[in-house]
Swiss-Prot record:
Its main location: Golgi. The lineage of its organism: Eukaryota, Viridiplantae, Streptophyta, Embryophyta, Tracheophyta. It holds the Pfam family ENTH. GO terms for cellular component: clathrin-coated vesicle; endosome; trans-Golgi network. Mediates clathrin-dependent trafficking of vacuolar cargo from the trans-Golgi network (TGN). Promotes plant growth. Residues 520-536 have a biased composition (Polar residues). Residues 20-150 form the VHS domain. Disruption phenotype: Abnormal vacuolar trafficking of soluble cargo proteins, and premature termination of the shoot apical meristem and of floral meristems. Plant missing both AGD5 and MTV1 are severely dwarfed, develop short siliques, exhibit abscission defect, and have altered subcellular distribution of clathrin-coated vesicle (CCV) cargo exported from the trans-Golgi network (TGN). It comes from the Eukaryota. InterPro entries: ARM-type_fold (IPR016024), ENTH (IPR013809), ENTH/VHS_tepsin (IPR035802), ENTH_VHS (IPR008942), TEPSIN (IPR039273), VHS_dom (IPR002014). This is Protein MODIFIED TRANSPORT TO THE VACUOLE 1. Expressed in inflorescence stems, stigmas, roots, roots meristems, embryos, and floral and leaf vasculatures, but absent from the floral abscission zone. It comes from Arabidopsis thaliana (Mouse-ear cress). Coiled coil: none annotated. GO terms for molecular function: clathrin binding; phosphatidylinositol binding; ubiquitin binding.
Length: 690
């Protein structure tokens, strides 16, 4: 019975080991490891040996995953299962040592990674098995004051938290000897460094900022060359001044900064860090910083800010610039005015930030430089050492070259002084037939495209060439030898004045003399020695003296006498047409349309009756026209007064279509015209009978 119970218990213990070291790529749960440790710690020695055998058998498994889990179980249980299990593992440590050079089959997916994990875990297990018992006792309950620690490298060295004296907190007092003594005292409590000068690995300290670049000696500190060849930045604030110092003083002050940080540096580290989501500090954080900084030493705060501006991390420099900008905006304060003066004399760090490839850092640095320069944005051009040469402005070529000079003032001066153009200007676009007469023009007569009325002249005496003179320079016939030197030919004026043409020889033929050979008066054309040319202005003009004065009548001069030289044709109206002659009226109306006046109409009817009574007196004119049927202009050749009425009895003219009078209204037939027709018929019949 006892044997069966022991067998069941043994099987149950083996199942516990198999569950922790299963061939699955999963980490064994910690609570199962704790159950095994509790069982080993409270069991008999025989049961502990049985557990050890089960675990060592799992080391012989072919799977590298099982081997690694068995080694991890041994490593974990050695420190928590008591001394009996440790002694058993020490007796059988050969099985663990054989896995130092384990080389199994490479995994198709992970390759040799699993085999390498077995080798590394074997080394760690041997180290845990043969470690001192005092260091491997079960962990006592942790005190509340102990800080939280995580897993990491075993070579991690916690930086010692040295107690700082009161003198290390004092800033701005004492002499250089006191500070040198403080630095020597601080050096004695520093952890020892390697003799070769390289510092050992120091992990992050959770009590301080993760971005403190001055925690070790290998921090970034750019070298600055002074005028005297010395280098380094002066951190000595004893005399209240700043400037360049020697390299030894820089190193000693750097050692003081490493050991004992001032209140200003501590305050600055609370806001100037590289961590965090925000690139710039919040407004509330800056407000709290300004309130605290107003109570501190401005010189030490300036030096601390200058150190942050030399940080290798651009995030730290960005936040330092934000803090400096907030301080500069409060420069009315006496304490912050010292910071303004300090950075006005030390612009190197800010100008280096202005040259950063980070756009946000560059913009912030330029803004700080503008505040330092009194609100004027200087950027990179503020320092003589970092001046950037501006590229010379390249004049673009004139793509639309009109030939005009860009210097309009010179053109105006040339016009005022009356200077002449030495060379011929380009021909205007409208001057197709331009000649060489334009070369002699002065600059005062120069045309410009800006003045559309430059060529318009309201004085007939000015001799100025028109811009639209398409026929300037064209001559028809021979040129006169007496042409003026600079006379510009005018447009062809058919109806204009020809005073100049009368002075030409009589045999000259001119384009202006189109009507020269036409004659209206037959006698004038047959006289000897008479000129064969008629001036254009006299073509339709009235003569100065007439042998017969036409009486005035309200009909518009239709019944009046016609002037000599006028074409005697019934298609043209007689006399002078009134000013209100309508546009749609025909050329041969009985009288022109006028506003209706009934008094005048009564007199007109009386004149018509008189006109019809005198019709019989004109029979002889009809006989004369019948004899000279081929001559239209036969009347009035004797030089006397011509007939005042149209030749209505001319038989050679075709019948005229009835004309419209009074604005197109059709004239009604009357008995008076029927009487005229009957009278003419009877007169012709009488002539035939006789």
């Amino acid at each position: 019975m006892d044997t069966s119970r022991r067998a069941v218990e043994s099987y149950w213990r083996s199942r516990m080991i198999d569950a922790v070291t299963s061939d699955e790529d999963k980490v064994a749960p910690v609570y199962k490891l704790e159950e095994i440790c509790d069982l080993l710690r409270s069991s008999h020695v025989s049961i502990v040996k049985e557990f050890s055998e089960f675990i060592l058998k799992r080391l012989d498994n072919k799977s590298p995953i099982v081997k690694q889990k068995a080694l991890r179980l041994i490593k974990y249980a050695v420190g928590k299962s008591g001394s009996e299990f440790r002694r058993e593992m020490q007796r059988n440590s050969v099985a663990v040592r054989n896995l130092f050079h384990y080389k199994g089959h490479p995994d198709p997916l992970k390759g040799d990674a699993l085999n390498k994990a077995v080798r590394e875990t074997a080394h760690e297990t041997i180290s845990a098995i043969f470690s001192e018992e005092n260091g491997t006792k079960p962990a006592a309950p942790e005190s509340i004051n102990r800080r939280i620690e995580g897993f990491g490298n075993t070579n991690f060295q916690v930086p010692s938290n040295d107690n700082k004296s009161f003198l290390s907190e004092v800033v701005g007092i004492g002499s250089a000897s006191i500070k040198q003594g403080i630095s020597n005292f601080a050096q004695g409590h520093l952890p020892k460094k390697n003799e070769n000068g390289s510092s050992s690995y120091r992990g992050p300290n959770l009590h301080r900022s993760l971005t403190m670049e001055n925690e070790n000696f290998s921090r970034y500190d750019p070298v600055k060359l002074g005028k005297d060849g010395n280098y380094g930045t002066s951190k000595n604030t004893t005399g209240g001044s700043w400037g360049h110092a020697s390299g030894e003083a820089s190193e000693s002050s750097a050692s003081v900064r490493v050991e004992s940080k001032t209140r200003e540096e501590k305050l600055l580290e609370t806001i100037v860090t590289s961590g965090g989501v925000r690139l710039q500090p919040t407004r509330d954080a800056l407000h709290v910083f300004i309130l605290e900084a107003a109570k501190m030493d401005a010189v030490a705060l300036s030096i601390a800010l200058d150190g942050k501006l030399h940080s290798p991390m651009w995030q730290v420099r960005m936040k330092a610039l934000c803090v400096l900008e907030a301080i500069l905006r409060k420069k009315e304060d006496e304490n912050f005015s010292i910071v303004h003066t300090y950075f006005s004399e030390n612009l190197d760090a800010i100008q280096r930030c202005a040259e950063s490839p980070q756009s946000s850092l560059r913009e912030k640095a330029n803004k700080v430089l503008s505040l330092l320069n009194g609100g004027q944005s200087s950027g990179l051009m503020s320092s003589s050492d970092n001046t950037v040469k501006r590229e010379a402005a390249v004049d673009l070529p004139d793509l639309i070259d009109t030939g005009d000079s860009d210097d309009t003032l010179n053109n105006l001066n040339a016009i005022d002084t009356g200077s002449t153009v030495a060379t011929a200007g380009p021909l205007m676009d409208d001057d197709w037939f331009g000649d060489s007469s334009d070369i002699g023009l002065s600059s005062s007569e120069k045309k410009t495209d800006d003045d559309p009325f430059a060529d318009v002249s309201f004085h007939p005496n000015e001799e100025k060439e028109s811009a639209d003179d398409l026929f300037s320079g064209m001559t028809v016939g021979e040129k006169s030898a007496a042409v003026g030197g600079n006379h510009v030919p005018d447009l062809f004026d058919m109806f204009g004045s020809t005073a100049k043409l009368e002075a030409e020889p009589k045999d000259a033929k001119n384009i202006n003399d189109l009507m020269g050979s036409f004659s209206i008066d037959e006698n004038n054309s047959n006289q000897k020695g008479s000129s064969s040319s008629t001036l254009p202005q006299d073509l339709f003009a009235m003569p100065s003296t007439t042998s017969h004065q036409a009486p005035e009548n309200p009909v518009g001069g239709i019944l009046g006498s016609q002037n000599p030289g006028f074409i005697q044709n019934t298609m043209l109206p007689g006399g002078v047409m009134p000013f209100n002659f309508p546009q749609g009226m025909m050329m041969n109306p009985a009288f022109a349309s006028q506003p209706l006046n009934y008094a005048a109409m009564a007199s007109l009817l009386a004149q018509q009756q008189q006109y019809l009574g005198n019709m019989s007196n004109f029979q002889q004119f009809g006989n004369l026209n019948a004899q000279g049927s081929g001559n239209v202009l036969s009347m009035g050749t004797s030089g006397g007064n011509q007939s005042a009425l149209p030749d209505i009895f001319q038989p050679n003219f075709g019948n005229q279509a009835p004309t419209s009078t009074m604005n197109g209204s059709k004239k009604e037939d009357t008995r008076a015209f029927d009487f005229i027709s009957d009278h003419l018929t009877s007169a012709r019949d009488t002539k035939r009978v006789s």
